[in-house]
Each structure stands twice: as C-alpha cells, then as structure tokens.
C-alpha cells in the first residue's frame, strides 16, 4: 500500500514523528490526525499549541506538505462529530503534493 500509519502516544509526539517521515524522502505528504480534548488543567492549551506550531513549521522546513488534522475540542462528543471531515485531510494532502511538485518542476 502507498499509505503508512504510525501511531503515537499523544498529540505532543505528532511533530517529531511527522518530521521523521517528511525528512525520509519516502512520502509526498504527511497527515497528522488526532484529538486534544480539554480537561481541567492548562495542559490542553500547551499540547494544542505545540502540536499545531510543530506541524506548521514542518511544512515550511521540509517542503513536504504536513496536514494538520488534529481536533481541539471541549468534549469527546465534539471530537467524534468532527471525525467525518477526515477525508478532507487526504484531499488536501494530494492537492498540496501535486501543487508543490508542479511548482518545483516549473
């Protein structure tokens, strides 16, 4: 298959895993999918921000599209309700990989 799935322990670990994949030259795009659900501490804000910043920085640093598919929600129900949008992540990955290939070939 042309798809590799890598499971990580949490959203905080997504950027380093995505970086390894993007820098390997084995992938045209990387999609990070997960959920960070607010708890009773500020941990939610820290994890969400670091995951978001790290993933965004990777696209620029590596030139490989890294798609942010991490849901940041207040409840588990909200996270499950949004999972239906996941096919859009694959579409964005293909679109960006094709666009960057076209720009690099120009």
In which residue ranges do the predicted regions lie?
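C-terminal binding/interaction regions
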Residues: 44, 49-106
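Short beta-strand elements in bilobed, periplasmic/extracellular small-molecule ligand-binding domains
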Residues: 1-7, 68
